[in-house]
Amino acid sequence: MQALSITLAKRIVGDSAFQNIAAWLAIGAVACLMGCSAMNAQNPSGNLKPVNAHVIDGTSHVMLKGHDVVSYFTQNKHAMGSAQFASVYEGVNFYFANAEHKALFDKEPSKYLPQYGGYCANGIVYGIPWGGDADSWMMLGGKLYMFGGQGSRDGFLLDVPGNTALADKYWREEVAGSNSFWQRTKRLTLRVPHYKSGKQLADEVAAKKAKGQGLRAEG
């Protein structure tokens, strides 16, 4: 009976689609079993979700592993915050390096929030909320963008206007308000039409640099 059901399902949706769906469900099941703590940390109860947050010393929903989001704006660098100077905004815990930065954030929190919940901006281009390292970032138009490393940052810089537009679109239409683990699983299985692998991006970056064309952010 089970074999017959699988055969019928394949006929209805197609073998390739069936394999994608099966993989999606399998990966999702593993994520639920192995990543409950991380899933909870990245999906708080407030409106600011999903977020690149972690459990730090028993405190859940800590943005960017406790790094000070205000330091990027005031000192043009990343700095570790402290639980001594902490604020809670939309169910997310933010740590700051000093009382001055905490006060600035408390006065206007939306000004200092990293784009796309603090996830790697280049991942959001493909609808995938993951990554986002405190020491890999850039400012564009007065906004803070995080990346999962130099390779991701360079990939985004290949086409800043186009990639920003795509990231804005997928964040607005798919990622914002979703469960990060399910969204990630979906878009790793059912990839967007413009998806590029890390190797493809690295090759494009290398080709551009070989032509003497630099990679730089505007704004």
Predicted regions mapped to residue ranges:
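N-terminal secretory signal peptides that target proteins for export/translocation
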Residues: 1-19
